[in-house]
UniProtKB/Swiss-Prot annotation:
Matches recorded under NCBIfam families: PRK11072.1, PRK14108.1
Gene behind this protein: glnE
Annotated organism of origin: Bradyrhizobium sp. (strain BTAi1 / ATCC BAA-1182)
Top enzyme class: transferase
Name of this protein: Bifunctional glutamine synthetase adenylyltransferase/adenylyl-removing enzyme
Ranges where the record places region Adenylyl transferase: 477-985
Length: 985
């Protein structure tokens, strides 16, 4: 890695202070891009820049940016003189002057448009300067985060001051000082999270909470505080996050306020204090550790924080405080899992060994002891580690190792976000992507970067795990009741009813049976003891399930099925984390719970140490499938083993979704890889068996095309398989050569029926998949299998626009190489033909309206069909492909997310729209994976259990379910706006 100590030669210009830079993988291409840009500039400016870039590191940095960061290279090219000015500046002084000058200009501005332009110019110049200082090693990472925070705080202050001065001009506000209208206005803004701690990351949203004191304000007499301050807050968010030709300043997140789904964006201090006193939760206590007044009436804010202090900092380590801490840890364990740390796809923020664990390590101990030890009440994470060390709560070694890891991981996070100005935290999912990133980060190879990353992740994970050695289970303590007393014990019945069981009599009888040890699994004393020890945690987990009573029944079936499963029960007794995971499976996802109850051997997958490691790729899945099938004696046994393999794969992937250890995209790919492997295997098996009965036709070829979710590699736990079967043969000899000969089309129709039966026939182990072949040419009116020539003719002459939209997801998953190539050429020809954009837009919009009329689009939680839902995003991606593939064939991809990336890169989709659609698609995929796993019918939040709501909130990166719904409404509104602007205006 090209790096050394951060540059600290004060007074030197930036170009002379770089001490590190990217490793450029393709220098010729990067040089070409750089020289093309320089050639476009005015000669004297180009000469000046060439001189500045003559030395190694400045040029290396710019080449790395040109190669890996479209966002930063756009900033460089947008204003070459600004870039030159930055290279010649002393960065610290330049940033301070930039903020100061912008403040003066905003103060003098006379229109909102001018303010928005000035703030966006500030952000763009600061973003480029800070990135150069980070990439070039000029500033250490915490100076980078402080600089980012300074820009954000200054922008909020400037915007709010402008708005308040405008309100004073309108006569709605009577400030004590016209030049300082914040003083005494009653409204104040709390910076939360990393902004509050002065640790903002490069492309971070800013988390703000806006409060106002209704008794202390400078409003005109006839102005009501609530609507006034709500309007000001909405205007503040608009000034900062609306996208204009100059970009945006910061995305603003106001959802950390109390009960965001039902409260206004500006909230009175009285209402907030009442909420925190009555309903405040552990995560809100932890969040308030970092709260800081960043703008507005400082005196009112300080008074509010003083009143809030007892909520955050408890004076006594009472039972409830300890329970809160254990609950925080338990939730992280259950939802994030206990993975073997991976490199590809690893989330450096919330993944194992990541930034969140360091923050949690510090915040947990601050919550425990901060009430009695005021010196622990600090905001920055590294400062918290320092005071915890000084107070003997942690060792110097822990502080030093966690500090080093934190700084490293924050730099990784920044570099990820610099690539496209997106708030991402996960490394690329593939080794090639990680290699590209590693070079941008300054490493020469993926291996060296991976070695350092894994070292730090494992260090963090170790310290985090040791923190709770006093109670490694993190389980809650329940009231002492006799769980084996049966339904005649009033206290037990009251307790079970209080936990939320609808049929406490049934539950009590079941518990009595368990503890009586009558099941075969309890035949040994050791197993009975292990089971008794973890029963309170199990009951607690089931009580918070989506369907608690059903989860108890499922677990009872599971125990009865464990005829020889004493080893598993002993394992559960020794590993409470696994108990929590099983309780989550049985509670939140009844479908998985029923599978586990019917097939206890599925538990073996959870014991496998590879379970929480990297997801198996196609090659490994193929090897596992072959091992599963290798000694199958009969066709029926072969089908049974295929079903077992499919169920085990679904169970393990589903459990990883629930535990939060795989992303929706990884899960969708994994489900698709499993299905693809099974389809290919069944295709080969049925081909051989059918030929044994009916022979073969000369020159015969068959192929299976995946469509829909399988084609897009976006499957869920409940996806069926959308397939098309194509065939070809020698038309001069159409008869098969077997004893029961069949001719041409009839042969392949019977073959297709046999293939479908292999998937859908029900054995003792259920069905493999439901098969849907309605996307074949002519749909239900057409034959089950299509001749290749008929398929080509149909796509060229008869297919409707919607059929070509569906064809964008077509993927040949089982065929000979030569036949595959012929099919892919037909698909490409169909997709790449010139089309009328207006006609296609009209067809797509009409199709969307037809779906809305049939399916409805008003249900927020119909993530596919809702206005602004996944159909809108898929239709945009498909529209862009059909319209532009003729001239830009590289836009084609089966994945909507990839299409959006290509479309942005090719300049046919604005960056702002692409970001909105990508973020929305990822959110919808995350939530859809869980809903398909946990809910068999329409999702109704008011009927859902706490477990499921918590899983959904976690998946949506929201503090609670109400905040998730608020985010979902906002997201769907933004997506529908983009859809309308592209297809209906």
């Amino acid at each position: 890695m090209t790096s050394s100590a951060p540059g600290n030669a004060d007074g030197q210009i930036l170009a002379e202070r770089f001490v590190s830079g990217p490793h450029v993988r393709a220098p010729d291409k990067a040089e070409h891009r750089l020289n093309e840009w320089l050639a476009e500039l005015e000669p004297s400016l180009a000469a000046s820049l060439r001189a500045l870039l003559a030395k190694g590191l400045p040029r290396s940095i710019l080449l790395g940016i040109a190669e890996c960061s479209p966002y930063l290279f756009d900033l460089v090219r947008a204003d070459a003189r600004r870039f030159e000015r930055l290279l010649r500046s002393e960065p610290q002084a330049h940033l301070a002057e930039l903020i100061s000058r912008t403040g003066r200009e905003v103060f003098a501005a006379t229109s909102e448009a001018d303010v928005m332009r000035l703030l966006r110019q500030l952000k763009s110049e600061a973003a480029l300067l800070i990135a150069l200082c980070d990439i070039g090693g000029v500033w250490p990472v915490m100076q980078v985060t402080a600089a980012l925070t300074d820009v954000a705080v200054s922008a909020v202050q400037m915007a709010l001051r402008y708005l308040l001065r405008q309100e004073a001009v309108r006569g709605r506000l009577a400030p004590r000082d016209a030049d300082d209208p914040e003083q005494g206005c009653g409204l104040f803004v709390l910076a939360m999270g990393k902004m509050g701690a002065g640790e903002l990351n490069y492309s971070s949203d800013i988390d703000l909470i806006v409060f106002f004191d209704p008794e202390v304000h400078s409003l005109a007499r006839d102005i009501e505080p609530q609507p006034f301050f709500v309007r000001v807050t909405q205007a503040l968010a608009r000034l900062l996050q609306s996208r204009t030709a100059d970009g945006y300043v910061f995305r603003v997140d106001l959802r950390l306020r109390p009960d965001p789904a039902s409260t206004q964006v500006a909230m009175s201090t009285e209402a907030a204090l009442h909420y925190y006193e009555r309903e405040g939760r552990t995560w809100e206590r932890a969040a308030m550790i970092k709260a800081r007044i960043c703008a507005g009436d400082v005196a009112a804010g300080e008074a509010m924080l003083a009143e809030l202090s007892p909520f955050v900092w408890r004076k006594h380590l009472d039972f409830q405080a300890l329970t809160d801490v254990h609950d925080m840890k338990r939730q992280m364990q259950v939802y994030r899992g206990h993975s073997e740390i991976a490199v590809e796809g690893h989330n450096v923020k919330v993944g194992r060994g990541g930034i969140r664990e360091i923050e949690f390590f510090a915040q947990t101990q601050q919550l425990i002891a901060g009430g009695r030890h005021p010196e622990l009440r600090v905001r920055p994470t590294l400062q918290a580690l320092g005071v915890l060390t000084a107070s003997k709560w942690i060792t110097e070694q822990a502080r030093d190792e966690l500090t080093t890891a934190y700084e490293f991981l924050r730099r990784v996070e920044h570099r990820l976000q610099m690539m496209a100005d997106e708030q991402i935290h996960s490394l690329p999912d593939d080794a090639e992507g990680v290699s590209r990133f590693a070079c941008f980060f300054g490493y020469e190879s993926r291996e060296r970067f991976a070695s350092d990353l894994l070292f730090h992740l494992n260090i963090v994970q170790g310290h985090y795990a040791r923190l709770f050695e006093g109670d490694p289970t993190g389980t809650v303590s329940l009231p002492p009741v006799n769980y084996g007393a049966g339904p005649d014990e009033p206290r037990l019945m009251e307790h079970l009813a209080g936990l939320g069981f609808r049929d406490p009599v049934m539950v009590a009888k079941t518990l009595q049976q368990w503890l009586a040890g009558e099941y075969r699994v309890f035949r040994t004393e050791a197993t009975r003891t292990s089971f008794t020890e973890f029963l309170p945690a199990l009951i607690d987990g089931l009580a918070h399930a989506d369907e608690p009573d059903r989860a108890v029944v499922a677990f009872d079936r599971f125990l009865q099925a464990l005829q020889l499963g004493g080893r598993l029960i002993s394992l559960l007794g020794q590993n409470r984390d696994l108990v929590a995971l099983v309780a989550l499976v049985l509670g939140a996802a009844p479908r998985l719970g029923d599978m586990l109850a019917r097939q206890p051997r599925l538990m073996d997958g959870l014991i496998d140490p590879r379970f929480f490691g990297a997801m198996p790729d196609k090659r490994e899945l193929s090897q596992r499938l072959a091992a599963t099938l290798q000694d199958a004696g009969t066709y029926e046994e072969f089908l049974d083993r295929l079903r077992l393999f499919g169920q085990e794969s679904l169970f393990l992937i589903g459990t990883r979704i629930l535990s939060g250890t795989v992303s929706a995209q990884q899960a969708g790919t994994a489900f698709a890889d499993v299905a693809e492997g099974i389809v290919h295997t069944v295709h080969g098996l049925v081909t051989e068996r059918f030929a044994a009965q009916h022979g073969r036709i000369k020159g015969q070829e068959t192929a299976i095309i995946a469509m829909g979710r399988l084609g897009a590699r976006e499957m869920t736990a409940s996806s069926d398989l959308d397939l098309i079967l194509l065939y070809d043969f020698d038309a001069d000899e159409p008869d098969s050569d077997g004893e029961r000969s069949l001719q041409g089309a009839h042969y392949f129709a019977r073959f297709t029926q046999r293939l479908i039966s292999a998937f859908t026939s029900r054995t003792n182990y259920g069905v493999l998949y439901d098969i849907d072949m309605r996307l074949r040419p002519s749909g239900r009116a057409g034959p089950l299998a299509s001749h290749l020539d008929s398929f080509a003719h149909y796509q060229e002459r008869e297919a409707w626009t919607w059929e070509h939209m569906a064809l964008t997801r077509a993927r040949v998953i089982s065929a000979s190489p030569a036949f595959r190539a012929r099919i892919e050429e037909i698909i490409q020809t169909a997709l790449r033909r010139p089309r009328d954009p207006v006609a296609i837009a009209r067809d797509v919009a009409d199709m969307r309206r037809a779906i809305a009329a049939e399916k409805g689009e008003a249900d927020l939680w119909d993530l596919k069909h809702a206005a602004g839902g996944m159909v809108d995003i898929d239709f945009v991606a498909q529209y862009l492909q059909l319209v532009h593939a003729a001239t830009k064939p590289e836009i084609l991809d089966v994945s909507s997310l990839q299409v959006l990336d290509h479309a942005e890169r090719l300049g046919v989709l604005p960056r702002a729209d692409a970001v909105i659609l990508r973020h929305a698609a990822r959110l919808y995929h995350d939530l859809t994976q869980i809903l398909r796993l946990c809910v068999s019918d329409k999702f109704k939040p008011d009927q859902a259990g706490e477990d499921l709501l918590r899983v959904l909130a976690r998946a949506g990166d929201a503090p609670d379910f109400s905040a998730l719904e608020a985010r979902l409404r906002e997201t769907q509104s933004e997506v529908r706006r983009v859809f309308t602007s592209l297809l209906e205006e």
